[in-house]
């Protein structure tokens, strides 16, 4: 089973999302972070489940995480014995 690794950027993204939404509803943002962390765990069991990222090679994939009105997207790259979470964004964010 591949090891799940969070890149420093992905960890910063989760912190940024937390800070951005914490003033609105503390309980909801805690549930969102938990949903993100729980959802990506499946990638260590089935790393090819996400959708391939168009225009990018090297196996980059996006994993859709449903939550609330929109949800999140985790960009990741599966490798031989690891799955690297590269970034996490709101689905509504541009440029991802």
Named regions from a protein language model:
Residues 1-61:
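Basic, Lys/Arg-enriched alpha-helical interface segments
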Residues 47-81:
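Basic/aromatic recognition patch in beta-strand/loop cores that engages polyanionic ligands
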Residues 21-23, 67-96:
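Enriched for short, Lys/Arg-rich terminal
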């Amino acid at each position: 089973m591949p090891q799940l690794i969070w890149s420093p950027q992905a960890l910063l993204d989760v912190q940024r999302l937390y800070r951005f939404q914490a003033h609105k509803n503390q309980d909801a943002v805690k549930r969102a972070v938990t949903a993100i962390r729980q959802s990506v765990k499946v990638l260590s069991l089935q790393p090819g489940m996400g959708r391939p990222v168009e225009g990018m090679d090297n196996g980059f994939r996006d994993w859709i995480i449903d939550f609330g009105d929109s949800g999140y997207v985790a960009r990741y790259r599966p490798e031989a014995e690891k799955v690297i979470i590269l970034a996490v964004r709101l689905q509504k964010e541009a440029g991802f």
